[in-house]
Amino acid sequence: MAIEEVIDRAVQLRQTIEIEYCTRSGRVFTCLISDIIYSRYYGGQYILAYRLDIKEERTFKISRIQKVNGHSFSRIFWNQIGDNFNRI
């Protein structure tokens, strides 16, 4: 199952999920999110969700989600960090 399918299922079933997320700067963190919806402002490649650990709503780019509930999704792409491009 692709990550988009897992996210879509979580949106439809209103599930709380644990994600591992890589920020644009390359920092990786894990958090629980709930109340997940697709972002109307940023389009279908982003979700809006409530982070339970910091008790705030946040926007997440779907392609930066590396794991959902412990399941890894391998993606090979180039990510620009600063002035350098790094393979992730």
Residue ranges and their predicted role:
Residues 1-88:
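Core beta-strand-centered patch of the WYL/Sm-like small regulatory domain
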